[in-house]
């Protein structure tokens, strides 16, 4: 249950050291691990899309891997670039928004690579500052408005 890209490995077709990687990650079977297929579109970034009060912020932060790295996480050296949501991003965020809001989740960060939803983050939905600074969209104001509405209801 790492964050910031901790514990992410890319295993290629030769599966070199796969057994050792699995043993390390799952602590010899004591921990659950998640595995996903490599998504080549990671080169364009792992996009963090914020959903506040069930509504998507109209910009994502694409966290773009640098050099030979496959992790785009800012903590792993990725470059954060704010960009408008794509049509696919809007579709994903609009489908999730009402479901997340119905579950009482006021602030959620979803991660998308290409057009694939890869994570739903309810405990560490970051990127307010980067989106606000780069895109000029006031994410904190949207959050405060949603929080006030939630408290009033």
Go through each PLM region and give its residues.
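Short, solvent-exposed secondary-structure boundary motifs
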Residues: 1, 38-42, 98-102
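Short glycine-rich anion-binding loops that position phosphate/pyrophosphate groups of nucleotides
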Residues: 1-3, 125
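Phosphate-binding site of ATP-dependent enzymes
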Residues: 4-92
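ATP-dependent carboxylate activation and anion-phosphoryl transfer catalytic cores
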Residues: 68, 84-153
């Amino acid at each position: 249950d790492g964050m910031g890209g901790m514990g992410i490995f890319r295993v290629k077709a030769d599966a070199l050291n796969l057994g050792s990687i699995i043993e390390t990650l799952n602590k010899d079977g004591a921990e659950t691990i998640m595995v996903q297929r490599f998504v080549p579109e990671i080169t364009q970034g792992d996009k963090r899309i914020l959903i506040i009060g069930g509504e998507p912020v109209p910009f994502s932060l694409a966290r773009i891997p640098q050099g030979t790295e496959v992790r785009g996480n800012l903590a792993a050296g990725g470059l954060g670039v704010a960009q408008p949501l794509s049509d696919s991003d809007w579709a994903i965020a609009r489908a999730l928004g009402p479901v997340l809001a119905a579950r009482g989740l006021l602030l959620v960060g979803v991660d998308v690579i290409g057009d694939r939803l890869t994570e739903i983050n309810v405990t560490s939905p970051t990127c307010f500052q980067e989106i606000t600074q780069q895109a000029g969209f006031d994410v904190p104001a949207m959050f405060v408005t949603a929080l006030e509405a939630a408290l009033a209801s």
